[in-house]
Amino acid sequence: MENILDLWNQALAQIEKKLSKPSFETWMKSTKAHSLQGDTLTITAPNEFARDWLESRYLHLIADTIYELTGEELSVKFVIPQNQDEENFLPKPQVKKAAKEEPSDFPQSMLNPKYTFDTFVIGSGNRFAHAASLAVAEAPAKAYNPLFIYGGVGLGKTHLMHAIGHYVIDHNPSAKVVYLSSEKFTNEFINSIRDNKAVDFRNRYRNVDVLLIDDIQFLAGKEQTQEEFFHTFNTLHEESKQIVISSDRPPKEIPTLEDRLRSRFEWGLITDITPPDLETRIAILRKKAKAEGLDIPNEVMLYIANQIDSNIRELEGALIRVVAYSSLINKDINADLAAEALKDIIPSSKPKVITIKEIQRIVGQQFNIKLEDFKAKKRTKSVAFPRQIAMYLSREMTDSSLPKIGEEFGGRDHTTVIHAHEKISKLLIDDEQLQQQVKEIKELLK
């Protein structure tokens, strides 16, 4: 058979003719020929997501194309660099493998290779937490000990903890670094008592150089586990070992947490992470697209970033959803396609913002008056009454201040707004017709 690289290039040329442009560029373009052993052709995919997608969607297409070119029936297998044995296909060696030289009861570091400082996107909401984490990684137990990072789900706390672990190991391969969740700590502690191995458990976690413990809030209410962690914390701190803790809330807000633990968490530095702003969300999407080898138009990234503002996980998940949807329906990725792909998840997470001008527009339609009438000095009932309804709704359905509402209604005094609100509120108690009118207007606004 001809050179495998030439064969795969020919196959790609044929496959490109059979697929839509977005499907080919998203899934096939970044693949590479790896090896041919027996009747198995192995192809390298750039990442796990691409590998899984190729296996589920394009195996038969590739096998048929190879058969057309060679007349041979070959099975096709996809791999990613991390899964292959050849040295040139492996990622940079992780120096944490030195941990294998430790006794078998020493816990594995359990660090995610994707979570490093290089892959962390810095923004206004996480800049301080990132700087503190880097300082701790550069000088364990000398900068801030403990470092306590808190914030909502999916904002990057775990990423920073893993990044600290990687940095420490990269600069000190013999360092004993352990990452675990408080739930795992609790389960192992319970098992150690049941199996009469409490001493082994204590030795395991009190002989590390860096302890990274995630979601500490789950220790709340677990008195025995808190007792054990209290002594583990004391031992490590007294021996100048670094402790990094994460939580979804600051120590003072964790219920049923012992005061002595709470005070120790406050010994070092407490820093929070807040949801990313628009610029950071766009940067996160760009980095994710680059890492996955995806070609995403700027307008699509802007659309997703504007719609998903809760956390990073949902943001990246939305991007993958758009890419998958594009491939399924064989259409180019654009803002309209993104809106269609995300229509099921955006409404619940992105409530409509109601403005005073929108209220005036809808009320004007219902009562057949012009927009300028809301700001005019007219006092005829046909204008004044709808104006009062619009003022009432502006007070009820927006966050605007009384002066702001008055300004939007021709510069009227805030007392006029108060009077309108009180009048409509009283009328709504008994006036069923007005109740129905206001209900219909609210439905139109929503």
Curated annotation (Swiss-Prot):
Region of interest: Domain III, AAA+ region: 110-326
Predominant subcellular localization, coarse grouping: cytoplasm
Region of interest (Domain I, interacts with DnaA modulators), ranges: 1-72
GO terms for cellular component: cytoplasm; plasma membrane
Pfam families, per database record: Bac_DnaA, Bac_DnaA_C, DnaA_N
Annotated InterPro entries: AAA+_ATPase, Chromosome_initiator_DnaA, Chromosome_initiator_DnaA-like, Chromosome_initiator_DnaA_CS, DnaA_C, DnaA_dom, DnaA_N_dom, DnaA_N_sf
Function: Plays an essential role in the initiation and regulation of chromosomal replication. ATP-DnaA binds to the origin of replication (oriC) to initiate formation of the DNA replication initiation complex once per cell cycle. Binds the DnaA box (a 9 base pair repeat at the origin) and separates the double-stranded (ds)DNA. Forms a right-handed helical filament on oriC DNA; dsDNA binds to the exterior of the filament while single-stranded (ss)DNA is stabiized in the filament's interior.
Subunit structure: Oligomerizes as a right-handed, spiral filament on DNA at oriC.
Listed PANTHER family: CHROMOSOMAL REPLICATION INITIATOR PROTEIN DNAA
Name of this chain's protein: Chromosomal replication initiator protein DnaA
Organism: Bacillus velezensis (strain DSM 23117 / BGSC 10A6 / LMG 26770 / FZB42)
